[in-house]
Amino acid sequence: APETVVRVLLATAGLELTTQFPILSPSSGQPFAFADLRVDGTNLLLEIDGLVKYSAGNRSGLAPSEVVIAEKRREDRIRRLGWLVERLIVREIVTPGLVVRRVRRALAGVDRVA
């Protein structure tokens, strides 16, 4: 799976990650979303996007435009809670150096958390 490839690339680069990191609703304390990866000790979340989700043959049954809008709303809600989100596209992961550089660049602007 693409998430596994990214996790291994970044772990090899010395980053510690949590997979399927739950994003909790402040009102209920329950997860409303799961990020593909979280860079431990930071507020940086990584989402790995394939193209199938945004195609007419996606599993949700929604039109591609509706999928994009739903993803945008989900990401906006996550960002309002103070998380930073870096999106990687599946075709980018064939260039390991690019993935590591993008994540390191994103880390330059993150908050360190316990």
Predicted features, each with a name:
Residues 1-114:
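Surface segments flanking catalytic/ligand-binding clefts of nucleic-acid enzymes
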